[in-house]
Design a protein with these regions (language model features):
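Terminal amphipathic alpha-helical/low-complexity segments used for targeting or macromolecular assembly
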Residues: 1-57, 62, 193, 199, ...
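Glycine-rich hexapeptide-repeat left-handed beta-helix
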Residues: 18-19, 113-115, 120-223
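Short amphipathic alpha-helical segments with coiled-coil-like heptad repeat character
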Residues: 32-36, 90, 142, 184
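Short gly/ser/thr-rich secondary-structure transition/capping motifs
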Residues: 46-49, 63, 119, 159-161
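Glycine-rich active-site/cofactor-binding loop and its immediate structural neighborhood
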Residues: 60-62, 66-105
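Surface-exposed, flexible loop/turn segments at secondary-structure boundaries
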Residues: 72, 78, 90, 108, ...
Length: 223
């Protein structure tokens, strides 16, 4: 069993309006099937003076900036001061936190983005949770389904965890940096304050406070 990549170790629950709900789960992949019900529960209690309901089960903060060309399907919450840019494609089951950026031609599906998270340029993020201030460089994507369509298994060295999920993208801890054009394979988990080099192909778990160059070159950060 994987021990070092619990939700509590990866993210600050105070940095998402879903934090209290996520505390109910030990591992992040346990929460993925429940994102829709979390959004619906939160949406019903959002204050009308700060949020407006646009369409069925879509709540958008009045302070958020949403470009006219963006497509948003419910259930979805766009929290305060978030920016949904040109031609963003939000397919539903998406919670976009305070001050987040969802950029040009980016696609989201079944995700929670913690506050200040940025997916600003041509990113695909599906069946994933991205932590506070996590950033995905231009063109970096999450791959959320295996080519053989079997359930995703999360690997950490010799340890592993059966998720029971056919679809799981990536879990990024707070302050994670993903380099441009990287691919995060199904079941990737990246710890807090870890940097991934551009053009990387990542799978499995990467510990917090590391620099990932490739599978054979993962170095601990030194301050």
């Amino acid at each position: 069993m994987i021990k070092d990549f619990t939700l509590e170790q990866l993210v600050d629950f105070n940095e998402s309006i879903a934090g209290d709900y996520l505390k109910e789960y030990t591992y992040p992949w346990e929460a993925l099937p429940h994102i829709e019900e979390i959004i619906l529960a939160i949406g019903k209690s959002l204050p009308e003076d700060r949020f407006e309901k646009r369409g069925e089960n879509i709540w958008i903060a009045k302070s958020a900036v949403v470009f006219n060309s963006a497509y948003i399907a419910g259930p979805c919450i766009i929290d305060e001061d978030a920016e949904i840019r040109q031609c963003a494609f939000i397919r539903g089951k998406a919670l976009v936190g305070k001050g987040c950026v969802v950029g040009n031609s980016c696609e989201l599906k079944n995700v929670i983005l913690f506050n200040k998270c940025e997916v600003p340029h041509y990113n695909y993020v599906g069946d994933s949770i991205l932590g506070f201030h996590a950033h995905m460089g231009a063109g970096s994507i999450t791959s959320n389904i295996k080519s053989d369509r079997t359930n995703v298994v999360v690997h950490d060295g010799e340890d592993s965890a059966e998720t029971g999920l056919r679809k799981m993208g990536a879990i990024l801890g707070d302050w994670t940096e993903i380099g441009c054009n990287s691919v995060l394979n199904p079941g990737t988990v990246v710890g807090r304050h870890t940097n991934v080099y551009p053009l990387s192909m990542v799978r499995g778990c990467i510990a917090a406070n590391h620099i990932y160059k490739d599978r054979e070159h993962v170095a601990e950060k030194h301050t």
